[in-house]
UniProtKB/Swiss-Prot annotation:
Annotated Low complexity bias: 1-27, 140-162
Upper lineage: Eukaryota, Amoebozoa, Evosea, Eumycetozoa, Dictyostelia
The protein, known as: Putative uncharacterized protein DDB_G0287413
Region (Disordered): 1-28, 140-205
Top-level taxon of the source organism: Eukaryota
Species this protein is from: Dictyostelium discoideum
């Protein structure tokens, strides 16, 4: 199973240089990383259709601001990364939360990784904080375990400690991360960022739109 996921880092690194071109205020950037096992049964094909529909919806609305223009006419492929810039505030959070709620309920036991990171800036004062957050949220996938860990501390982090972020490596979980007013202490940050507003039957929990800066849905291989 793990052999299908050895090219994750290369695919991700090819797109990282596109993050630094957006200097406008009140921006949102969404990084969408879909990683599906090669085994494509009917339900997995349905999953592709849902994601493709979401991509087209976002493309039609924001095609003038797309950062990766070479991906516009391509179907979502294994471990494809799409990035969009200069979004209206909070609109895509609602769209993605709805779509991910569908995916969680329908494909919770499937062998796939679904990760969405939403980074937003609500006002001019948050612009620099938002740029720092872009640097601090790091995504890595290892070929040995095919795990994806997302860290949100404001200090140097260790991405290999995925067990600190997820209780059960075989269980799909949702992690909400607070805006950057949490403790500078690494351990406190990890604890504060876990399971905030999470509800088993409601992917958004009791959270209001825009309350959380980072949003991750995950199923380990």
């Amino acid at each position: 199973m793990n052999n299908n996921n050895n090219n994750n880092n290369n695919n991700n690194n090819n797109n990282n240089n596109n993050n630094n071109n957006n200097n406008n205020n009140n921006n949102e950037e969404i990084k969408f990383n879909l990683n599906i096992n090669e085994e494509k049964d009917d339900e997995i094909k349905d999953l592709y259709k849902v994601i493709e529909s979401l991509k087209k919806e976002l493309f039609e609305k924001y095609k003038e601001n797309l950062l990766l223009k070479e991906n516009l006419d391509q179907e979502i492929e294994f471990n494809k990364v799409l990035k969009f810039g200069m979004f209206e505030k909070n609109k895509e959070f609602e769209i993605l939360a709805t779509q991910l709620g569908i995916l969680k309920s329908k494909y919770g036991n499937k062998k796939c990784d679904i990760e969405v990171i939403i980074i937003s800036s609500d006002d001019e004062d948050d612009d620099n904080k938002n740029k720092n957050q872009l640097k601090d949220i790091t995504t890595t996938t290892t070929s040995s375990t095919t795990t994806t860990t997302t860290t949100t501390s404001t200090t140097t982090t260790n991405n290999s400690s995925s067990e600190n972020n997820f209780d059960d490596q075989n269980k799909e979980e949702v992690v909400f991360c607070k805006p950057y007013n949490q403790s500078d202490n690494d351990e406190d940050s990890k604890n504060n960022s876990k399971d905030l507003g999470y509800n088993e039957n409601n992917i958004g929990g009791d959270a209001t739109v825009g309350e959380y800066n980072s949003y991750v849905v995950k199923k380990e291989m």
